[in-house]
Amino acid sequence: MKDTPRKRPRQQRSRDTVDALLEAAAQVFEREGAEATTNRIAERAGFSIGTLYQYFPHKQAMLRALAERHIAEGHSRLAALSARLAEEKPDWPGTVRAFATEFAVLHTERPHLHAVLYELTPRSPEGVAALRALHDAAVAEVAVQLRRTGVEEGAGAERTAALLVHTADATLHRVLLGDQDAAEALTSSLLALRPATRNR
């Protein structure tokens, strides 16, 4: 079963329609989880089911589109954070706090939707590759900051960065999902992994 959109919107009106359909899908998936249907999504968006099917063949395609947007938001937040850290140059604890805050926002703004995407989105090779690309980008940026703050040098920076990113992701998905204090809790957890560098 193909889980990609039927057609890509080219005109602004079509893009607006897709945006409305995906926001409606997000709301219905948040509320109903796996029980969500394309009929309820179309009704929520104010469109006919025929209009929905012009763009999405089934709800799995909508899940994939929502997941793609979530990953794109992750890249955007990471790029903005990288620029901010390059300008502000905080110490290591401040850097960890900045990363933890951005990671937490991605998971706590709409926690029920995030949980649905994590559990129900079809695992395609393209989707796995997209997630890996975001993970690798985060690891690369953390490694840059480890070197900048003098916490790690050489190949050790990549290893430590991978450990920190993996820990952050696992902690947010399995322990802190939906916790409004996730950023503070995650900051403490990540700093505790390297207590000798806490004050650098």
Question: What are these regions, as identified by a protein language model?
Answer:
Residues 1-16, 85, 200:
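N-terminal intrinsically disordered/low-complexity leader segments
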Residues 3-9, 35-37, 45, 59, ...:
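Short glycine/proline-centered loop/turn elements that form peptide/ligand docking sites
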Residues 16, 20, 24, 28-61, ...:
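Helix-turn-helix
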Residues 21-29, 70, 74, 103, ...:
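Short hydrophobic clusters on alpha-helical segments that form packing/core surfaces
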Residues 63-70, 134, 138:
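Alpha-helical DNA-contacting segments of helix-turn-helix folds
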Residues 65, 79-108, 160-164:
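Hydrophobic alpha-helical connector segments
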Residues 83-89, 109-114, 120-125, 135-161, ...:
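Hydrophobic alpha-helical bundle segments that form small-molecule/ligand-binding pockets
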Residues 119, 128, 147-191:
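Hydrophobic/aromatic-rich alpha-helical bundle segments in the mid-to-C-terminal region
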